[in-house]
Amino acid sequence: MKEKMYVASSLTEVEELAVKELGVAKDDMYFDVISEENNEVQVHVMVDANPVKKGKDFLEKFLEEANILGFVERKMRDNVVEYCITTENANGLLIGKNSKTLSALQYITSLIVNQYFDPETENGLIVKVDIGDYRRRRDENLEKMATRIAKEVAK
């Protein structure tokens, strides 16, 4: 997670600087005052958030704002987090033409999740979003097609 040391004239100033520089809400940070001397405060600021939960919260809020009934399930393995969205009748709308809407949703979710990691010291997480098992079914169909074409070429 991101962390940084700040020296400023007040804790309020440190909070404002940290929010601006780290790009994270104040509620997602932990402030540890190291020293207070000569009208200066030295503070160690650490990001204290669960990025995987933030991604799920974003997707749930997105569904709610779009008036789409559905739920989001998350699966985590190694450094990959997969969000599986299940809806009754909005899969096509969320996937979009040529999967563009799904890809955009995955990209935005990845930005939200990885904003909590320091790119200089951490790799962050690989974020995948799937809607109604679309990506899994698509991968299976592509594998079958590749196998069929390979057999035709071999003849």
PLM feature segments, named:
Residues 1-155:
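RNA-contacting regions in translation and RNA-metabolism proteins
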